[in-house]
């Protein structure tokens, strides 16, 4: 685990409410849409998101999170993890269709450190938190022996894409979105990579 300086720190279970909100911001509403389908009777989509963030395992876990905290409030977050050197084949019978293009893109970058979530609360954007979190992601990638960063973004999210490109990421592949009932102006998922090793 790398050392972090304030306002950055490693995530905790107590960050679950903020992480759920920020993953939904980064995912442009897709997480909330999915959580509504996963909710138990009487459980809200937000409760599902918080429950998933509190898990010790899984891709969306506080254990994979780095947060920026100001005055006791989490205002930005990075969630990421190392991808295996050999991706597992996609099981089209088990994986929901809307995830297949995302998994196809992820599988194109084995051995990288995958930035699953990078989000800043709207009122704190433009202050360098995203750039600094990407710098932390590079340090985490190096500590994990990964060859670079990989990120998937909607083609409609021009602001995020500008940030990633400004930080040295380049487009390497595109896949059409499968939306089902999710509403989003994007048409494609774009895979960006920054090679560091």
Language-model-derived ranges and their functions:
Residues 54-67, 83-88, 114:
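A short helix-loop-beta-strand connector motif used in the catalytic cores of GNAT acetyltransferases and
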Residues 111-115, 125, 134, 141-152:
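Conserved GNAT acetyl-CoA-binding A-motif
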Residues 67, 73-82, 114, 119:
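Conserved beta-strand in the GNAT
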Residues 27-53, 64, 90, 99:
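Conserved GNAT-fold acetyl-CoA-binding loop/helix
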Residues 120, 126-143, 162-166:
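Conserved acetyl-CoA-binding loop-helix of GNAT-fold acetyltransferases
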Residues 97-100, 147-150, 154-161, 165-167, ...:
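C-terminal "cap" of GNAT-fold acetyltransferases
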Residues 7-22, 29-34:
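A short beta-loop-alpha structural element at the N-terminal edge
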Residues 82-117, 179-180:
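Conserved acyl-donor/pantetheine-binding loop and adjacent beta-alpha core of acyl/acetyltransferases
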